[in-house]
Design a protein with these regions (language model features):
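A feature for loop-to-transmembrane-helix boundaries and adjacent hydrophobic helices
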Residues: 1-152
Length: 152
């Protein structure tokens, strides 16, 4: 759910910045391609990272869980660049317009990771350490909330 919220908010912010920057209407095509390419890249890289340990590659591709941030960034960038090139858009100006939206969308995604107890850090005795007994994977030991660190 947070992935969808992040995508909608990110595209909305990108569209606002696109208008402010005077970029053409079809610049949003690059943003949409970035979202779909990002989802595909995130799933493929996660499946590659976990195949063998958690199951065969193709089973992991169609599983409910698992996305890799780096795969999402790479897939989104490649897809967005292909659309920018196809439409002959000014790549650096489009990337500059997309950057704030990407940062906000990433922060929204990290809130989702925190709420489900995913991607946490190493054990810690600091006052803000958090336990995720229902997390993915669960931990009853207090750990660094790296999702929130990354959000900042």
């Amino acid at each position: 759910m947070f992935v969808a919220v992040a995508a909608v908010v990110g595209l909305w912010l990108f569209e606002r910045e696109r208008r402010r920057s005077g970029l053409p209407n079809h610049t949003l095509d690059a943003g949409m391609a970035g979202v779909f390419g990002g989802l595909a890249g995130a799933k493929v890289v996660w499946a590659i990272e976990h195949m063998g340990r958690e199951g065969p590659f193709f089973d992991l591709l169609i599983s409910r869980g698992g996305l890799s941030w780096f795969g999402g960034f790479a897939g989104g960038l490649v897809a967005g660049l292909l659309v920018m090139r196809h439409h002959r858009l000014p790549i650096l100006r489009v990337l500059a317009a997309a950057t704030p939206a990407l940062a906000i969308a990433h922060a929204i995604g990290r809130v989702g990771c925190f709420l489900v107890g995913d991607d946490y850090g190493v054990p810690s005795d600091l006052p803000w350490a958090v336990a995720f007994p229902g997390g993915l994977p669960p931990t009853t030991s207090p750990v660094h909330p790296t999702q929130l660190y990354e959000m900042l």
